[in-house]
Amino acid sequence: MTTFSEQFPIVFQALNVGFLQTLKLFFVTLIGAIPLGLIISFGSMSRWSPLGFLRPYLKNLPKDSKLTWWQKTQLWFAVDFRPIRLIVRFVIWVVRGTPLMLQLLVFYYFPGLVLHKNIWGSGEAGRFLASSIAFIFNYACYFSEIFRGGIQGVPKGQQEAGQVLGMTSTQIFFKVTLLQMVKRIVPPMSNEVITLVKDTSLSRIIALQEIIWAGQAFLKGTQGISGAIWPLFFTGIYYLIFSGLLTLALGKLEKKLDYFKA
């Protein structure tokens, strides 16, 4: 039976390798989910309607029009039907209403069940790719709701002022809305980022060798050391240090953006 001093170097090296995988998944998710979340937020606020061109006509219908009230109601519903918004919000509802672990299993196994082949490839690279896509899609949906709240929280009068000045919609977003939105979303985004650090451990459900998987391997005896539970507890130190550093960095960013504070 090996002693603690003999086990420690082996465990430390394995946990470092697992933590690097955790870091990779964390940063890949952030890099992918933030821009995708912004795009999804635009979709959830979309005002496009396939029959929107009829809206001015309906507004100008004379009161003595031969259309019945029911026909007018049907027309109004048809004009106000916004398919992009409905589809995007339905997807967000599904993603937010189901566990991330279940989504990981669906992303990894469902394509193989339908296509009868493993589209992710074999080995750790395939599992990492599947995990990354599942995490990006999940967190993009959560981020999109934060972005939507930040955008809609900017007073409409400022956007209207930009239109009066002759600015395009793109110019209004980048020069008027974006900076104010960023300040509003930092606190809720900080919470989601810290949650992401811990959620990366869920990827072990498809055997991605992140840090928790590495710690469990020693308990199961698959790393040459059998029945050692202390490596699993030791993983908490990695999470605490990384979460602490992120909390400090995000706190400084929030203070820097808090320009209303005296």
Predicted regions, residues:
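Transmembrane alpha-helices and adjacent helix-loop boundaries
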Residues: 1-262
